[in-house]
Amino acid sequence: VNHSKGKILVIRGGAIGDFILTLPVFQQLRKYFPQTHLEVLGYPKVAQLAVESGWADACKSIESPGLVRFFAPRGPTPPDWLHYFSQFDIIISYLFDPDQLFQTNVQQAGSHHYIQGPHRPNDNTRLHAIDSLLQPLEKLAIYDVGMIPDLSRLARCQTPAKESKVQIAIHPGSGSPSKNWPLERWTHWCQAMCKDSHYHFMIVAGEADREAGETLARHLPDHCRTLHMNTPLPSVARAIAGSRLFVGHDSGISHLAAALGVPSLVLWGPTNLEVWQPRGKHVTVIESDQGLGGITSRQVSREAHRLMDGGS
């Protein structure tokens, strides 16, 4: 594709963390094709982050019923979708497509350059997920590694809080209970911090974390916390960006906080750290040989204060 024009489509489903780990793909495409229209086909609630942060120009929903036809062998494909795909010079797909049915059907739309990326990075390697997701760009002669997801543009849009309290954003949940620090530890730590009226907790919770978020909120004084339940992701991002510190687990929200550049303390469980940890000098990971239950409130307090004091 000519570096001064053309259109590139990146197809990426997945949850919040999966998408944020793919942001460096958009960042590199924007760097090497600055004048090219860059579009994302994904879940709008998540993919809109790429548009609002300036890495993509437009977002289209992957949840359209018409796309189902593209996963059927020799099935009739909707003309409107064929026309849509025909507009792009390069299509990079991270969809699970083991039999190449989707690719075969999309290629009916024209002679664009189709690049298949990994649906999910390999947990059994030592290669970070970001570098795995960047590998397809080698077909475009882009070989950069070590990239960090960057949502700093969203952070710059955040107006600093006028109140004098120090805001700490926390996410007491994740996609799996095995990745969570025990809720009683969260409660103990937050209650101890709330004894200092200087701190205010912003609790982030989605549908999967509802119980953890609500339970923790009930155990904290009203003046010491706010609860953001099922808040739209760009709004959550801006709220986290206004925080002095983020504390969470191996979750998409932790990747979001890291991408915003917020000093982050991540309590790590059983997942492969080399592959999945949020990147950045401002990110500190705590893990224990005894698992998450081996992480103490005292450890978390010590690291939290160090990060809020500007430590790294």
What are these regions (language model features)?
Residues V1-S312:
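Catalytic machinery of carbohydrate-active enzymes
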